[in-house]
């Protein structure tokens, strides 16, 4: 029994059961509709699209006036476009939020790097002052040993000029150097953490912007460009050969490519058709009497 001999009621029942069991989606119905005019007419039935509308958009309420004026397939398409626009808008908002987060992490990194540079300069200045004071103290100790009278007079003059003694300044500079080192350690730790979060946000943004079809097309375009250069090089190398045999080879290759393109053109519909016809015998044996099947 061929597919053309099956009555419309049975085809309609097959499509209805497929939609109810979630075996057929709106994509499958669209692929089935382009296989023949008969299936196009059956797949546009309002009862099938009513089931899909309830299943895919359970929160959508269809008014009686709109359902009577326009077919259910048009209502489903309108609702699908609205849902698609809503998802695209939500995706754009998520991208903007992620980009704002990345810019905030970048600003935080620049701020920490500036503070780290200031602390490093402060530490260097304190260490230079500390080393100068150490040299002064060592020189004063040596002079006190070899020329005590001169040192006493010089120290008396320095004490009168400076209110803070050398030992106190050394301790203050030492504490300031320790504080600078602690600040640098904390800033380095915070900078590593912020950079780690910045890298994570960059990867998340790349994954959010990833589009398989667009990226695949860009890759294929690059491959085609390189393949074109390779083909040109091979053609220039083999041009000195027999031109007649090359023409025959090109014709044979063109015919093979055309056959391959015709086969690949129907490969997308063949999977849906195979699923459709593999699903239909179960319904046929269930709803058609055995005597008709024998015929």
Curated annotation (Swiss-Prot):
Any one Gene Ontology BP term: protein ubiquitination
Pathway: Protein modification; protein ubiquitination
Domain F-box: 19-66
Residue runs in coiled coils: 82-129, 167-209
Assembly and binders: Part of a SCF (ASK-cullin-F-box) protein ligase complex. Interacts with SKP1A/ASK1 and SPK1B/ASK2.
UniProtKB keywords: Coiled coil, Ubl conjugation pathway
Region (Disordered): 217-245
Free-text comment on this protein's domains from its UniProt entry: The F-box is necessary for the interaction with ASK proteins.
Ranges annotated as biased composition (Polar residues): 235-245
Lineage: Eukaryota, Viridiplantae, Streptophyta, Embryophyta, Tracheophyta
GO cellular component terms, A-Z: nucleus; plasma membrane
Function in brief: Component of SCF(ASK-cullin-F-box) E3 ubiquitin ligase complexes, which may mediate the ubiquitination and subsequent proteasomal degradation of target proteins.
Protein's UniProt name: F-box protein SKIP24
InterPro entries per record: F-box-like_dom_sf
